[in-house]
Amino acid sequence: MVMTDPIADFLTRIRNANQAKHEVLEVPASNIKKGIADILKREGFVKNVEVIEDDKQGIIRVFLKYGQNGERVITNLKRISKPGLRVYTKHEDMPKVLNGLGIAIVSTSEGLLTDKEARQKNIGGEVLAYIW
């Protein structure tokens, strides 16, 4: 089966595992998924990220994070720019997700950045997803 939107698939797998309160999630690896997973770890949405190399494409293992009473750290994930409708923004028009409580993941000329990092570096780009 041909996957037309691997980013949306990755976000959906995280959302589903999060709703089911799974501790670990494994997805087929790609550079963009590694970048998104690293941002999620850096911003504190997941505990840890491991990349397992094999002879094929590799696997990304994401360790989901939950609060003290089992509440989810990731409330929701939303794909913004899709293959059928790309969404680009300038640095001055960069969206704030829930007034800064969430993050936007932006693909820029300097790689994947959060909305805050893109604003600081004065770089626009393609808004891939919102996470809060």
UniProtKB/Swiss-Prot annotation:
Transmembrane feature ranges: none
A Gene Ontology annotation in the biological process aspect, one of them, is: translation
Q: Which UniProt keywords apply?
A: Ribonucleoprotein, Ribosomal protein, RNA-binding, rRNA-binding
This entry's Gene Ontology molecular function terms read: rRNA binding; structural constituent of ribosome
Pfam families in alphabetical order: Ribosomal_S8
Which HAMAP family is this protein grouped with?
A: Ribosomal_uS8_B
Instruction: Tell me, in a sentence or two, what this protein's role is.
Output: One of the primary rRNA binding proteins, it binds directly to 16S rRNA central domain where it helps coordinate assembly of the platform of the 30S subunit.
Member of which family? Belongs to the universal ribosomal protein uS8 family.
Quaternary structure (record)? Part of the 30S ribosomal subunit. Contacts proteins S5 and S12.
Instruction: Report the protein name in the record.
Output: Small ribosomal subunit protein uS8
Question: Gene name?
Answer: rpsH
